[in-house]
């Protein structure tokens, strides 16, 4: 089972405060473990423009049609001070990993320098932190019914309203997650 370029969808019974009702985009999955980014947990009061200001990055030349007021996500509980940018190609940045034909993860400053300009990738998601699982840990959590899995969908990853991503990701595999046991008051 290789879950790279898949979503992990938290089951309703998963009550961990970070992973409750989360959708995790799996960036890497191999025999050593897995690494992913939570894509539906916005950090309070932190937008992309705020990250650029903190890093003293000024988009040049500024393309006013590109919105920089999108929220930054809590990507996971590890390295919460480190940025991870999921985006569509190109992948010609200093530190990029191609996850699929249409998805790239970049951790270098040069991608941030394109934000708000005509050189910005067409779709972006900025996160601080990541989630990881040791060898066999994720597979066991799936067997323990902590997660559903679904092939990743770029519309959900980049365009679906954040509050709807959990439910929409489950719909990819025909599940209405709000009617599952463990979701009180939504049946």
From Swiss-Prot:
Position of the signal peptide: none
One Pfam family, short name: DUF179
GO-annotated cellular components: cytosol
Entries under InterPro entries matching the protein: AlgH-like
Q: Which residues form a coiled coil?
A: none
**What family does this belong to?**
Belongs to the UPF0301 (AlgH) family.
This chain belongs to the protein called UPF0301 protein YqgE
Native organism is: Escherichia coli (strain SMS-3-5 / SECEC)
Q: What is the lineage of its organism?
A: Bacteria, Pseudomonadati, Pseudomonadota, Gammaproteobacteria, Enterobacterales
